Amino acid sequence: MKIAILYREEREKEGKFLKEKISKEHEVIEFGKANAPGRVTADLIVVVGGDGTVLKAAKKAADGTPMVGFKAGRLGFLTSYTLDEIDRFLEDLRNWNFREETRWFIQIESELGNHLALNDVTLERDLSGKMVEIEVEVEHHSSMWFFADGVVISTPTGSTAYSLSIGGPIIFPECEVLEISPIAPQFFLTRSVVIPSNFKVVVESQRDINMLVDGVLTGKTKRIEVKKSRRYVRILRPPEYDYVTVIRDKLGYGRRIE
C-alpha cells in the first residue's frame, strides 16, 4: 500500500516515528507538512497532529481518499489513534479492520475566490467594529435577517467546532444537513437553524466583514454563496469507535452524574 504521512509543523519528530514504523510494511511515498501546497495522491493518508492538521490535510487529498489521524493536539475529534497505538493501527490496517466515515466539504464562492471548508465558513465583524445586519437566504425560502456579530455556516463535521461554542447543536456526522448559527445576536430568541445539505445558502452583510474558512482568515467580503461540494474524504476509525462516547468523553455531553 502506498501511504502519505502529513504532519503538523511542530510534530516532525512524531511523524518520523510513524514513518519508521509504517515503512516496515508499506511504501511511504510522501512525507511532509500538512500545510504545504499541492495535492496528495496515495492509497492512504496518515495525519499527525490535531483537528486543524486534519482539516489542512483533507484539502490536499484526492476525492474519497481514506485518512487516519494520530492525535498530537488537544480535543482530536478527527483523529482516531494515539502514537502509542501504532502497533494496533498496523494490525487494523493489515486486516482493513476499520469503521469508515464519509466527511464532505462545503464550497464557498465570493469575490475572494472559491474555497472549500470541511468544518465551516464564518462571516464576522472586526473586533473594533459594530454589529452588522446580515441577510441569510436559504434556497426555495424567503430571507432571514440577523443583527449580530456574524454568522457561521457549518457542516456536521463543524458542528462540534465554532458552532458549538455559540450555542449550536451537535450533529452526527452521518447527517446530510447544514447548520446556520448567528454569532452573539441582538435578540435572545435568535438560534441556530438546520437545513438540508442540498439547499444553497446566500449570506450578505451591509458592509465588508471578515471571512474565515475553517478558522483561517481569507479577507473581507460582503457576500458569499455556500453549497455542498462533491468533494469528500473518508475518515478511518477503530472498529469499536463510538461517536457518543467521543462527545461524552471530550465534551462531557450526556455524562451520567454519579
UniProtKB/Swiss-Prot annotation:
| Binding of NAD(+), residues | D51, G52, K56, N119, D120, K130, D149, T160, A161, Y162, S163, L164, S165, A184
What's the protein name? NAD kinase
Indicate the residues that form the catalytic site. D51 (proton acceptor)
Chain coiled-coil ranges: none
**Which cofactor names does the annotation list?**
a divalent metal cation
Alphabetical list of SUPFAM superfamilies matching this protein: NAD kinase/diacylglycerol kinase-like (SSF111331)
In terms of NCBIfam families, this protein maps to: PRK14075.1 (NF010677)
Q: Which InterPro entries match?
A: ATP-NAD_kinase_N, ATP-NAD_kinase_PpnK-typ_C, NAD/diacylglycerol_kinase_sf, NADK
Q: Can you name a GO cellular component term?
A: cytoplasm
Organism listed in the record: Thermotoga sp. (strain RQ2)
Q: Which reaction does it catalyse?
A: NAD(+) + ATP = ADP + NADP(+) + H(+)
Q: Name one GO molecular function term.
A: ATP binding
What's the family? Belongs to the NAD kinase family.
Q: Which UniProt keywords apply?
A: ATP-binding, Cytoplasm, Kinase, NAD, NADP, Nucleotide-binding, Transferase
Q: Kindly list the biological process annotations in GO that this record carries.
A: NAD metabolic process; NADP biosynthetic process
Q: EC number(s)?
A: 2.7.1.23
> Which HAMAP family does the record associate with it?
NAD_kinase
Compartments (UniProt record): Cytoplasm
Function comment: Involved in the regulation of the intracellular balance of NAD and NADP, and is a key enzyme in the biosynthesis of NADP. Catalyzes specifically the phosphorylation on 2'-hydroxyl of the adenosine moiety of NAD to yield NADP.
Superkingdom field: Bacteria
